[in-house]
Amino acid sequence: GIKLPILILTAGTEMYPEVIEYSLEPGMPNVASLQKFSEVLKSQGISKYPVHVKFDTGMHRLGFMENELPALKDFLNAHPEVEAKSFYTHLAGADSPEHDEFTLGQLSLFDRLTNDVLSAIPYKPMRHAFNSAGIERFAEKYPQYQYDMARLGIGIYGISYVDDKNMKPSAFYRCPIVQIKTLGPNDGTVGYGRHGKLGPDGKTIATIPVGYADGINRHLSRGAASFEVNGHLCPTIGNVCMDMCMIDITGIDAKVGDTVTIFGDNPTANDLAAILDTIPYEIYTSVPARVKRVVTGI
């Protein structure tokens, strides 16, 4: 099992008893959260429970702003139930060069705000600010902002903000071919809405057991995306169905049971994101729980 501490970035107040039960460490974005968590701790006779205090340096989603620091300092000094294990912030645009000045402003503000709080409490929490983009684009040039830790998020999956060649994918979405049909030019069409055209020479079609209920966006239909089969990229044909979709494997040596890569090293999650005008985060998080996860190589 996992032996290292687990930071819960956003734990709802109703989850606090479970957080304590499983020795998790919650993020604290405001005094109200600290007060509620402190009450739960006090009712259980617990002191110095580790929490992680979030600072809002420009994302404006969660966290303490500068005008709230006096209340934060007072709380940390007055409530022995909690002990700040770390201070952290989140960068809003570290992936985009156009926002580099803003990102550096966030880091500078975080430095100043946390130094203010550090000077007012009798212990020294760790600090962390870099996300995956921050690590890749700022860590080497601005080592002073590496602090004590960094939060590697989507980088764990091998996604790069500079060049995909810098990273090796660690997450693959794969499935088997479940049926193959060789269709002639007079065999009609493929899929719902009859959008899959066979052309004058016909096509060889492979059906795979994933559809839009499995995170395969319908905008990847009708050849918009291609999936890898035995080293070849095979375009979708017709509309993506709920639980299945079809790909064109004409001229490719393939059989039922062969593996199809939806995303991984080719195509990458970035490739699919570009087709859908979105980000790779959405590609990964769109894969629902019903899709089996297999962990290997540990």
Where are these regions (language model features)?
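Active-site-proximal beta-alpha core segment in soluble small-molecule metabolic enzymes
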Residues: 1-126, 142
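Active-site anion/phosphate-binding pocket segments in diverse small-molecule metabolic enzymes
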Residues: 12-14, 18, 30-35, 104-298
